Amino acid sequence: MFTGVATALATPFQENGQLNLEAWAALIEDQIKEGVTGLVIGGTTGEGMTITDDEFETLLVRAVEVANGRAVIIAGTGSNNTAVSIEKTKRAAELGAEMAMVVTPYYNKSTQAGLIAHFTAIADASPIPLMLYNVPSRTGVALAPETVGELAEHPRITALKEASGDISVMAQMMAHIPEGFTVYCGNDDQILPYMAWGAQGVVSVLSNVYPGATVALAEALLAGDLQTARTWQIRLLPVIDELFAEVNPIPVKAALQARGFEVGAPRLPLVPMSATAEAKLLSAMEQFNEVRQ
């Protein structure tokens, strides 16, 4: 488990489309240096749906090596095929992952009973703790608060990344979970309200680009310093808006390139950020950088 910030890492590619492991190591070092306490490999931001199993394993092994115990390694092992998710989770544990982040099965549109059966089967087979991932805008299905409450009774289902974007859902989640179960915010523009409701941190896209500022925001909230937290959240909002002006991870890869990390373009079916949107993103970053100085 972690508190504070876990970065949903972007996956760097070379110009030929192959993994850029040098950039991968540099990105991880930057995250740890800035105080990030968790690293998510192969999630949405990491283009988990378009990297191969071999690439996923290569990224995971290298992340474990570079982090060397300095951050919690979280593997994105979700699938809409329960058996595939089970095997991927077991393999991730063998390679050194300390936790698995498992998204709700997409496209199938499971019932709540199906979601309970799906996650229970994965948890029963998993040697490491699971973080449920609720992101209905991408998957077409939402975890009901009552479902999360039931799943939270499983000893290996220990956390939830709540990315519905609905503050009222967060409130309902907190009303249904048992003591000791951890909720993390999954939306960078809602870190303050989610943590005010009791989330223990954020699984962040923003922290790829501004890890230190994201950590400062989360740490202020953990310390109960709402004034400082509000200041950070407000300053970061223009950048956050532009980081989601096109579908994630298109903008974050453009932002990382601007920061000097050779992450390359996203893989098809995603394409690089439009020139107009990128100009707005870079302008927002420049303005934020000026405010920080």
From Swiss-Prot:
This protein's source sits in the domain of life called Bacteria
By its UniProt entry, which SMART domains does this protein fall under?
DHDPS (SM01130)
Compartments reported by the entry: Cytoplasm
Q: One cellular component GO annotation, for this chain's record?
A: cytosol
Xref: PANTHER family: 4-HYDROXY-2-OXOGLUTARATE ALDOLASE, MITOCHONDRIAL (PTHR12128:SF66), DIHYDRODIPICOLINATE SYNTHASE (PTHR12128)
| Family the entry assigns | Belongs to the DapA family.
Which Gene Ontology terms cover its molecular function? 4-hydroxy-tetrahydrodipicolinate synthase activity
Which residues does pyruvate bind? T45, V203
Site feature: Part of a proton relay during catalysis = T44, Y107
Its biological purpose: Catalyzes the condensation of (S)-aspartate-beta-semialdehyde [(S)-ASA] and pyruvate to 4-hydroxy-tetrahydrodipicolinate (HTPA).
Q: What GO biological process, any one, is recorded here? A: lysine biosynthetic process via diaminopimelate
Question: Could you say which enzyme class this protein belongs to?
Answer: lyase
Q: Which reactions are catalysed by this chain?
A: L-aspartate 4-semialdehyde + pyruvate = (2S,4S)-4-hydroxy-2,3,4,5-tetrahydrodipicolinate + H2O + H(+)
The primary site where this protein sits is cytoplasm
Organism equals Exiguobacterium sp. (strain ATCC BAA-1283 / AT1b)
- What's in the keyword line of the UniProt record? Amino-acid biosynthesis, Cytoplasm, Diaminopimelate biosynthesis, Lyase, Lysine biosynthesis, Schiff base
Does the keyword Amino-acid biosynthesis belong to this entry?
yes
| HAMAP family in alphabetical order | DapA (MF_00418)
Task: Provide the assembly information.
Answer: Homotetramer; dimer of dimers.
Query: What name does the UniProt record give this protein?
Result: 4-hydroxy-tetrahydrodipicolinate synthase
Against InterPro entries, the record matches this protein to: Aldolase_TIM, DapA, DapA-like, Schiff_base-form_aldolases_AS, Schiff_base-form_aldolases_CS
Annotated pathway, please? Amino-acid biosynthesis; L-lysine biosynthesis via DAP pathway; (S)-tetrahydrodipicolinate from L-aspartate: step 3/4
Claim: Lyase is one of the keywords in the record: yes
Pfam families from the entry?
DHDPS (PF00701)
Q: Which residues cross the membrane?
A: none
Enzyme Commission number(s) from the entry: 4.3.3.7
